[in-house]
């Protein structure tokens, strides 16, 4: 493994890998792949991976492009997961350079998706290609799962690719999701889990009437307010050493006709639980519905479970990731389960270790999104070193 460390340091200093990875990342950024559009982005990756000896399987579901690129055979199966779709750039005039014209300035690569996550995807792809070149007869399988549906509904992307893999008996052993996990410096944080997400869509029924005759109406705002106050005050759980306590947040409330003298006939609210492994979605649903009935709220309520919580608290993948970050970057990464959901929720299952390891997240989804070109190279060597630890 010392040979890898020497090779990485020499390459970073010479700028060879930095130049190559930046070039691939720039090609990807140049594709305006705002969900659900691909704009030719995945074809760039497929072509390079095919040339490196990977077998490519296109997995298009409805209007979403996805692909599975694999090299090797059997277990263990190490997967690098990423997405080519990006969020809209927002006002173009606010950008210092066009969002889909990759621009390098002062060591930073600018463009929509630079950090989330085309830059990192380039690092993963090039590291994987280098690994199979150096170790053509490696153990097991190394694969890339690339989706075009992460930033939007996430209904026709990773979740369906994983379903297809499971149907044919391909079980993922380890998965590195390339989301931008770093907070202050590259490699300072590894996400070893994520909270679950459960959203409720509530419709409170009232009776519309004149504000001067409240006895002839039923105000859904008043009806719901006491229940809401209690919902906001509940301690749902205490969390644990890996997760903070489960949180309840209301994101939208809408009621009223716009007139100042009309009691509304209905109220709509949207709320969300970000829940730890100490709570279950069924128990949260039941608790909310029982509380609403206790407060005599007349309601309809539908639920959407976006993902269960997952946690990789130990294992070979986490050991390899921490060791490679320490070796290549020279820091000890911290473990965290903070933040929103990721596609890791679709991949996590019993027996599968899942982590997120990627670049700084300071500029993601922002105007002038950027990534350090040196960090692109460092990530390349971290991923390469991890592959050599696990599969060489």
Positions of predicted regions on the chain:
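Metal-dependent amide/peptide-bond hydrolase catalytic core
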Residues: 1-9, 16, 57, 180-185, ...
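N-terminal helical capping/dimerization or prosegment-like subdomains
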Residues: 2-92, 266-270, 283-290, 373-375
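Structural motif
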Residues: 76-79, 108, 143, 173-175, ...
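Active-site metal-coordination/substrate-binding segment of hydrolases
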Residues: 77-146, 168, 375-378
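Short beta-strand segments
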Residues: 81-83, 145-147, 175-179, 203-205, ...
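Acyl-CoA/ACP chain-elongation machinery
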Residues: 102, 149, 209
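Acidic/histidine-rich catalytic neighborhood of metal-dependent amide-processing enzymes
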Residues: 117-193, 391-392
